[in-house]
Regions:
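Glycine-/small-residue-rich "gating" segment that lines the acyl/pantetheine channel
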Residues: 3, 109-112, 142-178, 263-267
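A generic, well-ordered mixed alpha/beta core segment in the N-terminal half of proteins
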Residues: 90-142, 146-158
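Conserved "HGTGT" condensation-loop signature of ketosynthase/thiolase-family condensing enzymes
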Residues: 1-78, 82-101, 166-305
Length: 305
């Protein structure tokens, strides 16, 4: 089988990055790591989808500002999101002048964007390449499960999609951190069709990529301080460890998952956006979630579910 891993002779450098989050993300263990926090889930717009575009717009702008970069310095921007036709990205970055490559890789979009940006810069095809992505709890629920106004119950295996966006720029030269190598994953479908159990659906593919990296490089899990996955969460992380156990690959001692790290499951309750209806009724997933007639700056808040 052809190797899927490329080790760069001259590792490209991540020269700048920025992260934008929502209220719930700010209240988590890594809340202080965000460059900007937005308490309004609409981000001063009138729909959640437009709000998600603001996440990307803000992340790109802040990443440029932190490194004193101008738009003309960027040779290519690689971006995507979880929505149909990547509208969160295209509307979010359409005001920028740099060349754009749209990608769709669901939950691995940022990893793929960083992979492609690194290959473009390491190969001499770009001087500075940016990658950007975003997600929004409310847009993801409508896209993959049910609109919030449906009022459906969330099963124990359901994951909470982060309301956040991130951007970074990669250069052939610079200081650490470096991208020393990349592994292109393969499609692994074990037949999981439950949209409320994404951890089980993604764990086999995550394990396949991790295993392939170690097979290609001859390295072992113990060679790393941490092996970090994106959003397997509790169910997927347990399955990942079990898959490793079956093949003698110990992933239990140093595996971390961002989906588990970004929230404090002991202290944070699941919180839902609400708005005050004319009759004073408060609505959320358990009620009539009316946002279509909302105007920027009107009554919004957080509903404890």
């Amino acid at each position: 089988m052809q190797k899927a891993t490329t080790i760069f002779p001259n590792p490209p450098s991540i020269v700048t990055s920025a992260a934008v989050g929502g209220k719930m993300e700010h209240e988590g263990p890594y809340g202080g790591c965000f460059d900007k926090i937005n308490d309004d889930p609409y981000f001063t717009t009138d729909t959640f989808e437009k709000g998600e575009s603001q996440l990307q717009k803000q992340a790109v702008r802040m990443a440029l500002e932190k490194a004193n970069l101008k738009e003309d310095d960027i040779d290519v921007l690689i971006g995507g999101d979880l929505l149909d036709q990547c509208v969160g990205t295209t509307y979010g970055v359409r005001g920028y002048s740099f060349p754009f490559l749209g990608i769709y890789a669901a939950c691995s979009t940022m990893s793929e964007g960083l992979l492609l940006a690194s290959m473009l810069t390491a190969g001499g095809f770009a001087g500075l390449a940016m990658a950007v992505t975003s997600s929004h709890f409310c847009t993801a629920e409508r896209q993959y499960r049910m609109p919030l106004n449906y009022g459906g119950q969330r099963p124990p295996t359901a994951q909470w999609t982060a309301t956040a966006g991130g951007a970074l720029a990669v250069s052939p030269e610079g200081k650490a951190p470096y991208v020393r190598g990349v592994t292109v994953g393969r499609i692994v479908d074990m037949g999981i069709t439950d949209a409320n159990n994404m951890g089980a659906a993604m764990a086999p593919a995550a394990y396949s990529t991790i295993r392939e990296f170690f097979e290609d490089t001859g390295m072992r899990p113990a060679d790393f301080d941490h092996i970090v996955t994106g959003d397997l969460c509790k169910v997927g992380s347990r399955l990942l460890a079990q898959l490793g156990d079956k093949e003698g690959l110990d992933l239990r001692s140093n595996h971390l998952d961002c989906g588990l790290m970004i929230y404090d499951s002991d202290k944070q309750e699941q919180r839902l956006v609400f708005r005050r209806l004319p009759d004073g009724e408060r609505s959320g997933i358990g009620g009539a979630y009316r946002h279509h007639d909302r105007k920027p700056g009107t009554d919004t808040g957080v509903f404890r579910g």
